[in-house]
Amino acid sequence: MANVEAKQQQPDLAEKLIAVNRVSKVVKGGRIFSFTALTVVGDGAGKVGFGYGKAREVPAAIQKAMEKARRNMINVDLNGNTLQHPVKGRHAGSQVFMKPASEGTGIIAGGAMRAVLEVTGVQNVLSKCYGSTNPINVVRATISALENMNSPQSIAAKRGLRIDEILG
C-alpha cells in the first residue's frame, strides 16, 4: 500500500537506475547473495534525491532505493537550464567539478553524474570527475555540489545587499 501512495503523491518524477551490484555474505553453509541498487529521482525542475537499496532480489532492491530517493530530495537553485556558477563537490575519494555552459552545449558528464544532472533538470553543463569514480561516491559528491550552489538572490538576501551589488 505504501508504494501505491508514494507514486500517487509524486507522479511526475523522473527515475533513473544508476547501478545494480551483487554482493555476497559468506556463512558456514556457503555464500548468501544479495543485491544493491543505486537510483536517483528528480522532477526536472530543480528537485533531486538519491537512494541506495539492498535486498535479496533485484526488483526489491530497486524499489527500496526509489523509495529512499523520494524521501531524501533536495531543492537546487538553477539558472534556467544550467547552473548558477561553477561548483565543486567532494565525498570520500571522489571530487566533482561542474560549471555552467551556454545554450546548446548539452550535458558533458559521465556515468553517475550525468544521471543526477538529467533528473535535476540541468540541460547545459560542463563537468569533470576526479579521483574515485565509484558511482555511490560520485552521486553523493554531485548532490553535495548542487546543494552548495546559491543563486544571487539568496546571497543578496543573506548579506542584505541588492542583486546588482552581488553580481558586480
From Swiss-Prot:
Residues 13-76 form the S5 DRBM domain. One of its GO terms (biological process) is translation. The keyword Ribonucleoprotein applies. One of its GO terms (molecular function) is structural constituent of ribosome. One of its GO terms (cellular component) is small ribosomal subunit. The keyword rRNA-binding applies. It comes from the Bacteria. Disulfide bonds: none annotated. Keywords: Ribonucleoprotein, Ribosomal protein, RNA-binding, rRNA-binding. Belongs to the universal ribosomal protein uS5 family. PANTHER family: MITOCHONDRIAL RIBOSOMAL PROTEIN S5. HAMAP family: Ribosomal_uS5_B. Part of the 30S ribosomal subunit. Contacts proteins S4 and S8. With S4 and S12 plays an important role in translational accuracy. The N-terminal domain interacts with the head of the 30S subunit; the C-terminal domain interacts with the body and contacts protein S4. The interaction surface between S4 and S5 is involved in control of translational fidelity. This is Small ribosomal subunit protein uS5. It comes from Pseudoalteromonas translucida (strain TAC 125). The gene is rpsE.
